[in-house]
Amino acid sequence: RLYDDVDKATNHYFRMPCFNSGYREYLFNEIREVMEKEPDGIFVDCMIPKPCYCSNCLRKMAEKGIDVNDDAAVFKFQVDTLYEVFSQIHAIVTPKMRLYINSYSNDWFSEFEGHIELECLPTYTWGYDFFPAQAPYYRNLAPGKELVYMTGAMVTGWGDFSGYKPDAALECDVYDAMMYGYNPSVGDLMHPRDGLNR
């Protein structure tokens, strides 16, 4: 399928793995491997429904009678595919363990999550006014669920190995979380050469 919009066709989502391919089982095996370490929870990132026209998806859409030229139908097919994937992940993860699926919409997959996470790296593209504006809105998305403010120790974004935020910036993030009734979660990255710092 050809896109009229070059940016749409070549942005990073163009390279996202297809969950109707062998990648699905690869992901499940990774989750099973992590589960052996008895973690506090599983966070599945970047689970965003995007159109895919690989041979696996084309075959499955043909089996379901989906017109591949109908963008809305193709998008719904991908949402349904991810719903199926999340159902399977939910079955793998121990019921008492935390599970969060990071996606554009909490409505699609909220039944699999025991809490809501609001992601914000103020020193990156979000800015310091993002969290205070979004926190009350997110609280209303899932009444009664735990709220988590997910920030990070890195300065310029996820994947930044060059430096850490100053203490004052991290304290500001944690204080913001507590002020709005969120539990703070400070993300870190495992350096390719070593493990996480404790």
Question: What feature does the model see in each segment?
Answer:
Residues 30-33, 60, 191:
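Residue-level detector of solvent-exposed, low-hydrophobicity positions
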